[in-house]
Amino acid sequence: MAWIPLLLPLLILCTVSVASYELTQPSSVSVSPGQTARITCSGDVLAKKYARWFQQKPGQAPVLVIYKDSERPSGIPERFSGSSSGTTVTLTISGAQVEDEADYYCYSAADNN
């Protein structure tokens, strides 16, 4: 993907279906470096199950950035945060950096309590 100056595309998967659960995300979110990016994920299962967020850069394995809706694993920068409201979860990247350009996936499954 070509870098456009002052534009930080955060590309995300539109729809993920896992164990008959359908989760929907917008096709893309674009922000300038330093701005706040918010990526939503919605699905009925999210009212009962936690969401996890993964970041994946080209040629690399996915990295867990948020679990249990809002918990951040060790080593993940504080600019990454998660929240939940009803059937929607949100990944927020406050002060997005160029290195945050990636695909972001939300995930929830039957074994995810």
Curated annotation (Swiss-Prot):
Region ranges (Framework-2): 51-67
Signal peptide: 1-20
Keyword Lipid metabolism carried by entry: no
Region ranges (Complementarity-determining-2): 68-70
PROSITE patterns: IG_LIKE (PS50835)
Location (main, coarse): secreted
Region of interest (Framework-3), ranges: 71-106
Residue ranges, annotated region (Framework-1): 20-41
Disulphide connectivity of cysteines: 41-106
Tagged with keyword Membrane: yes
Keywords on record: Adaptive immunity, Cell membrane, Disulfide bond, Immunity, Immunoglobulin, Immunoglobulin domain, Membrane, Secreted, Signal
GO BP terms: adaptive immune response; immune response
One GO location term (cellular component): plasma membrane
Location of region: Complementarity-determining-1: 42-50
Superkingdom of origin organism: Eukaryota
InterPro entries linked: Ig-like_dom, Ig-like_dom_sf, Ig-like_fold, Ig_sub, Ig_V-set, IgV_Light_Chain
Subcellular location: Secreted; Cell membrane
One Gene Ontology molecular-function label: antigen binding
Domain named Ig-like: residues: 21-113
Pfam families named in the record: V-set
Region annotated Complementarity-determining-3, chain positions: 107-113
Record note on quaternary structure: Immunoglobulins are composed of two identical heavy chains and two identical light chains; disulfide-linked.
Function, as annotated: V region of the variable domain of immunoglobulin light chains that participates in the antigen recognition. Immunoglobulins, also known as antibodies, are membrane-bound or secreted glycoproteins produced by B lymphocytes. In the recognition phase of humoral immunity, the membrane-bound immunoglobulins serve as receptors which, upon binding of a specific antigen, trigger the clonal expansion and differentiation of B lymphocytes into immunoglobulins-secreting plasma cells.
UniProt-recorded name of the protein: Immunoglobulin lambda variable 3-27
Originating organism: Homo sapiens (Human)
